[in-house]
Swiss-Prot record:
Belongs to the UPF0173 family. The keyword ATP-binding does not apply. InterPro entries: Metallo-B-lactamas, RibonucZ/Hydroxyglut_hydro, UPF0173, UPF0173_UPF0282_UlaG_hydrolase. It comes from the Bacteria. Keywords: Hydrolase. It comes from Staphylococcus saprophyticus subsp. saprophyticus (strain ATCC 15305 / DSM 20229 / NCIMB 8711 / NCTC 7292 / S-41). Pfam families: Lactamase_B_2 (PF12706). This is UPF0173 metal-dependent hydrolase SSP1060.
Length: 229
């Protein structure tokens, strides 16, 4: 399995011949190494509706006829206002099998909206974390979230091989809470810090996160680099 990081919270993987992207914030993301106008994907998975996660979803979905997997509210928004053909609505606690693997959404503590052309926030359902079961590996993408103790429950139910976790602070966990989550609750084999350095408000030194983590291995990835299993 190819599993790579592409700036902010965007991850991409290929499994069983399918190409999948999570939170495709490409255009306007100074960290991204991808080109939304040429990227080919079969599936798009969204943790929530904020612009730095929703990103290029509409273009990618319509050009590729890709299936968008996300909250029911996000699905309704895409089909009603943007003519996206293929949507799979899900919600927290729900698990579904796809031809690339299994997807389960779990809790995240954040918010979820998108600002329309009139500057009005549109509610897009609950923010969610994401459990992926792919080719014998369990991947936990926490989404944007603060620290919460049920991360331990999530990891108890789904022992984690790779955890993508935000460290940017201000809008999500910072390094102190993220490292606590890894050390005390999630305890993955591999931790990958995300959601930092994209904007001034979330500038962080990922090496401080690495120094604070005492469980498993921390892999600090540059955009375009693969997780090393």
């Amino acid at each position: 399995m190819k599993l790579s990081f592409h700036g902010q919270s965007t991850i991409y993987f290929e499994a069983n011949g399918k190409k999948v992207i999570v939170d495709p914030f490409i255009t306007g993301n100074g960290q991204s190494d991808l080109d939304a106008s040429t990227l080919k994907v079969d599936y798009i998975i969204l943790t929530h509706g904020h612009g730095d996660h929703f990103g290029d979803t509409i273009e990618l979905a319509n050009r590729n006829h890709a299936t968008v997997i996300g909250s029911a509210e996000l699905g309704d928004y895409l089909t009603t206002y943007h003519n996206v053909e293929n949507v799979r609505p899900m919600n927290i606690g729900g698990k579904a099998e796809f031809d690339f693997g299994n997807v389960k959404f779990v809790q995240a503590f954040h918010s979820s909206s998108l600002t329309d052309e009139n500057g009005v926030p549109v509610y897009l359902g609950m923010p969610m974390g994401l459990i992926l079961e792919i080719e014998g590996k369990t991947i936990y993408h926490t989404g944007d979230t603060g620290l919460f103790s049920d991360m331990k429950l999530i990891a108890d139910r789904h022992p984690v091989d790779v955890c993508f976790i935000p460290i940017g602070d201000n809008f999500t966990m910072g390094i102190d809470d993220a490292s606590y989550a890894i050390n005390s609750f999630i305890k993955p084999k591999i931790s990958v810090p995300i959601h930092y350095d994209t904007f001034e408000l979330i500038e962080q030194d990922p090496n401080k996160f690495k120094q604070a983590v005492s469980v498993g291995e921390v892999q600090i990835l540059k955009p375009g680099e693969d997780v090393s299993f």
